[in-house]
């Protein structure tokens, strides 16, 4: 059995062995040994632990997570693997005053037990499932494969140099047509055949976006593509969860796919690049990222969009939600595109 440590903020009455159903043994630690301190600061932490002795380290709550990693949101990462050995989890004590978090706790508990027991494996992202294309012939062949594939839909995403098509251009597009792989295609390799094949694809298939209003603006403005049938996973999520800050592709990918925070290495690269070049956050643009650095993570965007849609399409089985989606949200997206482009 793997060697496991559990770290909470300070001594508490929570019976973690019971909370985890006695599924595994662990050594228990606290960041701060003084239970009387209300808000534990870094200066209060007196924990002594050799993390190299443990295969898994469960981090209970945001304080422990922030102490050992660069991540702040324990709710977002609860039950996920961070940096290969850390397992963040919300504090089950919070359920007494926040019972709506019960499902998050139960799902996280099952996930952690699975990782520790070996019945659940971390899913790694590499070029076997997410890859880049900079060759015209290879790009055209991939798009033709998407056209010929027997699924009725494809997922599409774009990487751009700006927020608005008049201020920037498209660096590349990400395409997944089978839910098993995604490709990031450099727009520099497009020729007339590429554009014709893409339009044929968009005419034949339903195209799934995440935040379609953003991507459609660039595809229509720079390439004059038409999209007769679209879906939007962000809008589908709005139908079941109206809370702000919960609709990002990363959050949904972490919750509904096995791929977790697949973009984290790229954002670490961005942080190092900004630091070494003295660039402020607002001065950074995506064209500063080399293709070979971006390709895997950009390709993953369309793959996880495809997988999230597979989870969300059953939402449309609810007739009332379907009416809102088909008659308000999707038409509203197209209307806002016209307003953005032409004004009111």
Please state what every model-predicted region is.
Residues 11, 20-24, 170-172, 339-344:
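Short, intrinsically disordered, charge-balanced linker/junction segments flanking boundaries
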Residues 134-152, 197-201:
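A short acidic-Thr-Gly-centered motif at the start of a beta-strand
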Residues 93-95, 103-106, 110, 116-134, ...:
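Active-site-proximal helix-loop-helix substrate-binding element of RNase H-like nuclease domains
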Residues 55-62, 155, 205-212:
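Acidic beta-strand-to-loop metal/phosphate-binding motif
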Residues 1-122:
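A polyanion-binding, active-site-adjacent surface
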Residues 323-344:
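Extended, well-ordered alpha-helical scaffold/bundle regions in very large, multi-domain proteins
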């Amino acid at each position: 059995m793997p060697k496991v440590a559990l770290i909470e903020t300070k001594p508490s009455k929570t019976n973690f062995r019971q909370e985890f159903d006695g599924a595994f043994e662990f050594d228990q630690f606290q960041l701060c040994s003084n239970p009387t301190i209300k808000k534990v600061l870094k200066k209060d932490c007196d924990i002594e632990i050799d993390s190299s002795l443990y295969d898994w380290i469960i981090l209970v709550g945001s304080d422990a997570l922030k102490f050992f990693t660069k991540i702040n949101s324990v709710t977002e990462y609860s039950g996920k693997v961070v940096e290969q050995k850390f397992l963040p989890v919300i504090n089950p004590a919070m359920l007494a005053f926040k019972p709506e978090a019960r499902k998050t706790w139960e799902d996280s508990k099952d996930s952690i037990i699975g990782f520790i027991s070996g019945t659940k494996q971390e899913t790694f992202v590499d070029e076997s499932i997410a890859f880049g294309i900079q060759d015209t012939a290879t790009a055209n062949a991939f798009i033709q494969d998407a056209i010929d594939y027997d699924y009725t839909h494809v997922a599409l995403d774009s990487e751009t140099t700006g927020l608005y098509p008049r201020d920037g251009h498209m660096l590349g597009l990400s395409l997944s047509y089978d839910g098993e792989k995604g490709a990031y295609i450099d727009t520099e390799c497009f020729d007339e055949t590429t554009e014709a094949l893409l339009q044929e694809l968009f005419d034949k298939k339903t195209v799934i976006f995440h935040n379609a209003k953003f991507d459609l603006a660039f595809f229509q403005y720079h390439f004059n593509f038409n999209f007769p049938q679209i879906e939007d996973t962000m809008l589908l999520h709005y139908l079941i969860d109206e809370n702000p800050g919960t609709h990002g592709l990363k959050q949904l990918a972490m919750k509904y796919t096995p791929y977790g925070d697949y973009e984290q290495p790229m954002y670490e690269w961005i942080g190092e690049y900004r630091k070494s070049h003295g660039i402020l956050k607002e001065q950074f643009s995506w064209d500063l990222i080399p293709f070979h650095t971006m390709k895997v993570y950009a390709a993953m965007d369309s793959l996880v969009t495809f997988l999230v849609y597979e989870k969300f399409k059953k939402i449309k089985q609810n007739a009332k939600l379907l009416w809102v989606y088909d008659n308000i949200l999707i038409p509203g997206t197209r209307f806002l595109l016209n307003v953005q482009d032409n004004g009111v």
